[in-house]
Each structure stands twice: as C-alpha cells, then as structure tokens.
From Swiss-Prot:
NCBIfam families: leuS_bact. It is found in: Cytoplasm. One of its GO terms (biological process) is leucyl-tRNA aminoacylation. It comes from Shigella boydii serotype 4 (strain Sb227). The gene is leuS. This is Leucine--tRNA ligase.
Length: 860
C-alpha cells in the first residue's frame, strides 16, 4: 500500500473495475427484496453543475447503502433530451439540436462516471430517440381513443421570445419560467390531455404519500384547488341564451349586484357589434396575460355590455359587464359579483359606480362598514329576505336547495386545475401523432406509421420549426387518402412523466412497458429532486402513473413511495460596476478576499484590480457567474472529497453553502483515514479478536465502534441525516487515531474498527473505501460486502456516570458499576473530597437517588 492518498490514481482504477465487472447492473430477482432509487434525470445542457452533483450524490449514497443491506438495488440514469435550449444552442453554434444533444450526453456521461455514481448503465435512455418516444406516441393515440385527449382553440400563455405556448405552471409572476420574458395571450388550436378527469384521485391519493414532504403535497392540493359550490343560471333580457356562473359562496347570493363576462364571451362579442368602446376593450384584452399571478395584480377594467340579467331570487335586473379579470378558460367565462363581500368585486364596483349591497353582518352583529373595503369573512345573513338570521353553512344549504328546486341551480364540485395543454410550436420535441385527412377528419396516426420520426438532419433559422417550414414533411397517406401530419410537438414534460417506468424495461419491443418487470420494480422507493418541480413534473408524473395503471401496465396507484427534495447549492457572489453602470459578475474562484477575525468577507477585488461588491451567498447560477465547476473540484481534490463535502456540509433537504475550506477539510479527513489504514497494515497480519480477553479500555473503544455503527445505520437508513452520520464516523476516527496499537488485541480491535469505518464510509466515498477494503483484506469486493451490524453486547455499559449533589448543588460526578446499589453509590460518593467536605459535621436528613443518574444528599 502506498503511503500517500492519491485520488487521481485510485479513482480511475476503481471506476474501470466497476465498468468491467458491470457491478451495478441488475435484473429482477424474486428471492431478494428490491429497492428502486431514482434521481430526476438531467437535461443534457453540456456540463454538470453542483446542483446535479448534490442530487446524484444523495441518490448514490442511498443506493449503495441499500445494496449493502442485501437488497436488489436499481439505480438507473438517462437524459431528458428534448427541449428548447438545444434549439438556441444549435442556432448559436450553427449545428442541429440532435448532434449538439448527443455530444453533450457523451460529455456529461463521462462526468457522471468520474464522480463514481453506481448506475446501471445498461438501462440508460435518451428521451429524444424514436425507440423511446414511439411508445409515448402510441400511448397518446390510445388516450385519444379513450376520450382522454381532445383539441380545442384556447387562449394560451405565449412566450414571444421562445415562440411557444407555456402551461400556467410555467408562468412565474407573469414571465416565462425559462427566459423571463413577459408572457402574452394568444388564441391557438391545441391538444389537451384530460388531467381533470383524475383531479379527485390526484387530490385524495396525496393522503397515501406519507413519505412525501408536506410542502409538496400542500402545493399540489392548492394547485388542484377543489371547491364545492353552486352553478347558477341567469336569464338575460334581449339575449337568446342564459348565463351560467359558479360560486363557492351562495350564502352571499342576495348581494349579487352585477355579472361580469370574459371579453371573449359570446354575449360580449354580440354586444360589441353596436358598441365601439366595447369592441376596443375586447381588442385590448387580447393582449391581457392569462397567468393567475398577473391577473391578481393587474388593474381591473371593464365596459358595460348594455345587457341586463335577472336575479333568480329577487327578480331584480342587474347589469352585465365585460371585464378583463374574467377568462373564458376558467369555468363558464362568466362570474357573479358580490361587491359587499368580495374585494375584487368591491374595487370594480367602486371604480364604475355599481351598486354595493351588504348581506352579511359583521362579527359583532352590526351592519358592516363598507366605506373602505368589502367584508370577506363568513357570518350571519341580513338584508336577504327569507334567509335572514342564517349562519354561513345554513345559508349555503338553504340558498343552494332553493335554486335547485327552482331549476336554476345545481350543486357542483369545481377544480382550479386545468387540462394539460401538451402542444408546443417548437421543433425539438416528439411529434404529436395525429393527422388531418383531406376531408377534414382528424384521427390518430395509425399504428403501422408509428413512430412519427422527427427528422434530425435539419437547418435551424431560430424562428420557424423545420417541420413547420417543410411542407413535404407533413404529407402522408392514411387509409388511401392524403393527409397532413400535426406539426406541433409534445410538451417535454410528457417524456419526463413516464421515463421512470421505462427504466424497468428499456429494451422491451412489444409495448410501452413490460408489466412483469415494471411491477417488480415499481413503485420507486425513493425519488430525489428539487422542490421547484412540485406542481409541474411531480403532478404529471403521478397522473401518468394512474393512466398507465388504468391501461393495465402497472398495478400500483402512485409512482414513488418517498420523495426527497434536496436543498439548493449556494456560493459567494461578487460584482463590480462597469463604465456604463452595468453589473459585471465575477466568479468566486477569481475573487481575492479579505476576511475579519470571524471569517466574514470584508473586502474583495479581482485580478484586474476591480473593487468587488460582495452580495452574500446566493444560488449558483449563470446570471451571477457564481457556479463552481464540479470537474475542476474533482481534478483538484478527487471525487470522494467532493461527495463527502456535499453530504457533510448540510442536511440533504437544506441549502448547502459552498465553501472551499470545507472541501479542504473533507480532503484532510480522507487523508487521515488513509494514513491510519496505512500505519495499521504496515504492521503485518492481525490475530483474531478475543472479546472475552479485552481490557476495560479496549472494551470502551469497542463500545464506541459499535455505538457508531448503530448511530450511522439509523442516521442513513431511518433518519436520512447523512451529515450527522459522517460526523459520528469522524468522531470515531479521532478516537481510533489515539488508540494504542502495540498489543495483539489492540491491533485486532483496530482491524474490526477499520473494517467497520470503511464500510460505513463506502456509500459516501466509494473509491477510497474500495481500495482500503482490499488493503485490509476484507472479503471480496466492498461493493458486495454486507453493512456492518452493531453488536448489542459490545454496546452494554459496564459503568455509568452519576451526578452527586449536596442540597441540590453539583459537588461531584462519579463513575460506578451499572449494577451498583444505592449504598455502594453513597459510599463511593463519600470518597470524593468535595462531597466529604460538605458532609463534615452535618446530618444527612434525606437522600434522593435516581438509579444510575443522580444522588442528592439533603443536609441540615
């Protein structure tokens, strides 16, 4: 064994061994308990970043630990390879998205291997290959036949920069989630999948997910947004149709003083024929944002349509307004307004001088003061005829029942969730497998024409999708009739909604899934990824699983038992102000810093002498140029050091602050482990451990070893507090470094301890542990070694520490045998100088003894 720890030598050797032995390839084995550990697959952007490294290190630690428990562990990896960035990069680099993507995959695959992740590479998949997306296309055609897919023209969120549609979830504060451009509203024909048909199940089954973070479940609950209410029909004078509205507050119905319809509503369109002001308003609304966050904050505007609706219970005529806060896509495109008890309705009514009628009493029973704002709390009705005096629940039921009896109301459950618009106007995605025949019939692409292959040898102009620009590509023949293919492609969330299931049978040629393999491995035991996916990917992921279950492919209700959302990786961020006042962000690697005595940064400059402004720690990002290249760190310290720092610096679900001093500390620790094993093995062979012949000191050290095994096992397995597991191993290492190594049993005990330490560290730092296991002559490869088991007998304490008090004040701490009697403890306490001093010449009036813990002598 060489004396120095040289990760650059050992890591490549160990990785080659894993490749040659195919160590992490697995097949179904009914004789073993399975464990499916999955990290969210990466987008092949070109280089791994520290967020990837953290995510995949957590997954690898869990997978290696479960493997050492003797389970059949599947840990696959693949590439979420479709998506917009490839188009931009292709234009910029004068290439096509496909070669750019495949080059990136090859590069990033090497980076993953360099970090020592134990993946089953035989299952690797890339979602941009026809072998993958053909089954997604086939499944879509089956959903269409089941009535779960439809096409309609709808107002969508349109990103003018990316030239594509965004789902509501992809609009953050009125801007595109990807490029931060202001989102516009546009009418466009789109394909939808009926996720709303599964809304109740998606909501109710959240209760089955005991091991998902409450925050994620809460976000999904709110996004699905189930509400119970009443649908009410209004007659409208001089208009051929009725208006239908939905309300969750029928108790306030007697205070309804106007209705509001969307600008795109047929009633508004009809009224606009003779109303130029309304026509102009409708035009203006075409550019209104359709994201909810934007709707909530924008100025509320409207125009009176001139139509009057009739209140079903009072018979009063109330005006119908067109308003920019009502959307055709939500509900019926019409809402009832109760300005006395809804703040938005109140602001609109105040602005346009509409009637405000209070119908709910204030909490103290008085009439509400509506001079400044609406009263939105629930309460007792007044000003409501026969319903006066009823509380919220009684009024809800009484008014709902009356409207139902009159034939103008119906109790309904509504959802905030909308159907999933899966059409994208981009090129680099899976073609949607639908065709339009010459006679106008729309139908799924026949099975014998699947997959509809996306051409990869294309020229990108940065504006139009190559398959839209090429009229020949769309031409096909179906049932002997000329037809045109759909030129939209799938939202890339389609591919990431079912990849986890395809990993169970990536080579299967007969269909989307081999049910036998899928049902052996699924559900995923632990799924690891960022919380930013809570209401997009993680909702579609659950939805697709239920679709596949109902198609008979899988037999479980949910795709993953446990979800672990890792925290972000933060780093120092610095900038200097340029000549034009712009901020120029400088990498923390290039910042020369001065720190105060507490280690805080007080001054910074770069190599060019610019005074730098330090903005603190923030998420690693390109925009702030504060990303740290994992490859540079691996080349400098080794993969094991980077992995160890990632797992030690912070709990897995909390933010991690990147500190190179911490990386150096992790590296020093591994050098100490190496040194201890080197010094131990240099002394030659080791005798067998004889636990009955150990001295008290040796027993105490062995107790520490086995207590550490118990703690680390609990920390990794049950608690998943990986940082505290590492801290416990470090603490044990400090004790081992000071332990005597001269005697035969000293060395035998050290051998047992080091074999345990190396196995406990193996999930975190597998390369060094693989090597040290061989040097310690451990049995076989460490990859097949069992996890160490704590010896219960070794952990039993022979002695215990008792606190001795006189009149409640601590005077001594004594070590006594665990089976010592009260008399023996009192006798031993009396031998302590300080205790004897306070007992001299006084009478002990009372003795309080808590066995093995406390002796309090009350004297007077």
């Amino acid at each position: 064994m060489q004396e120095q720890y040289r990760p650059e030598e050992i890591e490549s050797k160990v990785q080659l061994h894993w490749d040659e032995k195919r160590t992490f390839e697995v097949t179904e084995d009914e004789s073993k308990e399975k464990y499916y550990c999955l990290s969210m697959l990466p987008y092949p952007s070109g280089r791994l970043h520290m967020g990837h490294v953290r995510n995949y290190t957590i997954g690898d630690v869990i997978a290696r630990y479960q493997r050492m428990l003797g389970k059949n562990v599947l840990q696959p990896i693949g590439w979420d390879a479709f998506g917009l960035p490839a188009e931009g990069a292709a234009v910029k680099n004068n290439t096509a998205p496909a070669p750019w993507t495949y080059d990136n995959i090859a590069y990033m695959k090497n980076q993953l291997k360099m970090l020592g992740f134990g993946y089953d590479w035989s299952r690797e998949l890339a979602t941009c290959t026809p072998e993958y997306y053909r089954w997604e296309q086939k499944f879509f055609t089956e959903l269409y036949k089941k009535g779960l897919v439809y096409k309609k023209t709808s107002a969508v969120n349109w990103c003018p920069n990316d030239q594509t549609v965004l789902a509501n979830e992809q609009v953050i504060d009125g801007c595109c989630w990807r490029c931060d451009t202001k989102v516009e509203r546009k009418e466009i024909p789109q394909w939808f999948i009926k996720i709303t048909a599964y809304a109740d199940e998606l909501l109710n089954d959240l209760d089955k997910l005991d091991h998902w973070p409450d925050t994620v479940k809460s976000m999904q609950r709110n996004w699905i947004g189930r509400s119970e209410g009443v649908e009410i029909t209004f007659n409208v004078n001089d208009y051929d149709n009725t208006l239908t509205v939905y309300t969750t507050r029928p108790d306030t119905f007697m205070g309804c003083t106007y209705l509001a319809v969307a600008a795109g509503h047929p009633l508004a369109q009809k009224a606009a024929e003779n109303n130029p002001e309304l026509a102009a308003f409708i035009d203006e609304c075409r550019n209104t944002k359709v994201a909810e966050a934007e709707m909530a904050t924008m100025e509320k505007k409207g125009v009176d349509t001139g139509f009057k609706a009739v209140h079903p219970l009072t018979g009063e005529e109330i005006p119908v307004w067109a308003a920019n806060f009502v959307l055709m896509e939500y509900g019926t495109g019409a809402v009832m307004a109760v300005p006395g008890h809804d703040q938005r309705d109140y602001e609109f009514a105040s602005k346009y001088g509409l009637n405000i009628k209070p119908v709910i009493l204030a909490a103290d029973g008085s009439e509400p003061d509506l001079s400044q704002q609406a009263l939105t709390e629930k309460g007792v009705l007044f000003n409501s005829g026969e319903f006066n005096g009823l509380d919220h629940e009684a009024a809800f039921n009484a008014i709902a029942d009356k409207l139902t009896a009159m034939g103008v109301g119906e109790r309904k459950v509504n959802y905030r969730l909308r159907d999933w618009g899966v059409s994208r106007q981009r090129y680099w995605g899976a073609p949607i497998p639908m065709v339009t025949l010459e006679d106008g019939t729309v139908m799924p692409t026949p099975d014998d024409q699947l997959p509809v292959i996306l051409p990869e040898d294309v020229v990108m102009d940065g504006i139009t999708s190559p398959i839209k620009a090429d009229p020949e590509w769309a031409k096909t023949t179906v049932n002997g009739m000329p037809a045109l293919r759909e030129t939209d492609t799938f939202d890339t969330f389609m591919e990431s909604s079912w990849y986890y299931a395809r990993y169970t049978c990536p080579e299967y040629k007969e269909g989307m899934l081999d049910s036998e393999a899928a049902n052996y491995w699924l559900p995923v035991d632990i799924y690891i990824g960022g919380i930013e996916h809570a209401i997009m990917h993680l909702l579609y992921f659950r939805f697709f699983h239920k679709l596949m279950r109902d198609a008979g492919m899988v037999n479980s209700d949910e795709p993953a038992k446990q979800l672990l959302c890792q925290g972000m990786v933060l780093a120092d961020a610095f900038y200097y102000v340029g000549e034009n006042g712009e901020r120029n962000w400088v990498s923390p690697v290039d910042a020369i810093v001065e720190r105060d005595e507490k280690g805080r940064i007080v001054k910074a400059k770069d190599a060019a002498g610019h005074e730098l402004v330090y903005t603190g720690m923030s998420k690693m990002s390109k925009s702030k140029n504060n990303g740290i290249d994992p490859q540079v760190m691996v080349e400098r310290y080794g993969a094991d050091t980077v992995r160890l720092f990632m797992m030690f610096a912070s709990p897995a679900d909390m933010t991690l602050e990147w500190q190179e001093s911490g990386v150096e500390g992790a590296n020093r620790f591994l050098k100490r482990v190496w040194k201890l094993v080197y010094e131990h093995t240099a002394k030659g062979d080791v005798a067998a451990l004889n636990v009955d012949a150990l001295t008290e000191d040796q027993k105490a050290l062995r107790r520490d070893v086995h207590k550490t095994i118990a703690k680390v096992t609990d920390d990794i397995g049950r608690r998943q507090t990986f940082n505290t597991a590492i801290a416990a191993i470090m603490e044990l290492m400090n004790k081992l470094a000071k332990a005597p190594t001269d005697g035969e049993q000293d060395r035998a005990l050290m051998q047992e301890a080091l074999l345990a330490v190396v196995r406990m560290l193996n999930p975190f730092t597998p390369h060094i542990c693989f090597t040290l296991w061989q040097e310690l002559k451990g049995e076989g490869d460490i990859d097949n070694a069992p996890w160490p088991v704590a010896d219960e007998k070794a952990m039993v304490e022979d002695s215990t520490l008792v606190v001795v008090q006189v009149n409640g004040k601590v005077r001594a701490k004594i070590t006594v045998p665990v089976d010592a009697t009260e008399e023996q403890v009192r006798e031993r306490a009396g031998q302590e100088h300080l205790v004897a001093k306070y007992l001299d010449g006084v009478t002990v009036r009372k003795v309080i003894y808590v066995p093995g813990k406390l002796l309090n002598l009350v004297v007077g």
